[in-house]
Amino acid sequence: MGKGIAWQAMHNNPVSNAFIVHDLKVISETAERLGKKADADRYRRQLEATTKAYIEKFVSKKGIVAKDYQSAYIMALKFVLPEGELRELVKKNFAANIRKNGLQTGFFATEHLLPLLVEAGETELAYDILLQEGCPGWMYQIKCGATTTWERWDALKPDGTVNEEKMAGSGDNMV
């Protein structure tokens, strides 16, 4: 799905910071279940502060996330935004972005794409995306003979040749 993060653009901060919010939630809940109240309280405060900072930095009052970046919409909906008016605005803008621009999600966000569209009341759009045969799309990969989901939407070109971009392996700098 292109360089591990995004299909057409790289905006790491909203994606990585959404994971920080998620991690703080998991850690605070884990501490609570383990009976470590002081730790749970500390991580809950960090979670609240980080969530607030994320929303202030990446989500406009009109519900635009990270300059209208699809993966950021997904990560904000999945890990950051609580129920409420702002979340509903974000859902609407997310669906509108996909209708306007087509599929542009990256590796970390794509797994959450279809369920979040369904949650937003966009089941038909979710099915349209799932079944689209062009690149980017899952059916494109199947038509090209894929038996698993590729790391890049366009790992194989329509003519059957491999997209030549270097892999991000740690040995690249040795070649």
Please report, for each region that a protein language model flagged, where it lies by residue.
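Active-site core of glycosidic bond-cleaving carbohydrate-active enzymes
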Residues: 1-175
